[in-house]
């Protein structure tokens, strides 16, 4: 609830590091925001929600004439992919679309995302907990590490993506 996102400690490491200083060493000591107002913004982070995925293989392959050379094929695929992605989000500026090739370029899927850019650090354990065991224990089970960090997604008053603003509110899933 309230827009919380849990991820691995190493995935949040750069954000934790960017907020750290000699005075406030959040990597060494950890971080906890005891109120919404103390959560730390992260301008380089965003969270993407997958809205839908669609198989567009037929539309992509129909645009490629039989016998097309590989270099020309790549240009056609790139061009039609751009067009399909633009069509998919033409009526909604809050969405982003991309075409991904699968199986060596024999299948193509359109994915539509909604990106939230106001993401704030809520909690991070000290690195001694979040990275306990280091690479030695990374692929060994059972693991005994607190490998997590917590962020919160914020949205505008209509629960839509927005740039950082103190007026934004925690995101609530539909």
Question: Across the structure, where does each feature detected by a protein language model lie?
Answer:
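Terminal presequence/propeptide segments associated with secretion/organelle targeting
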Residues: 1-174
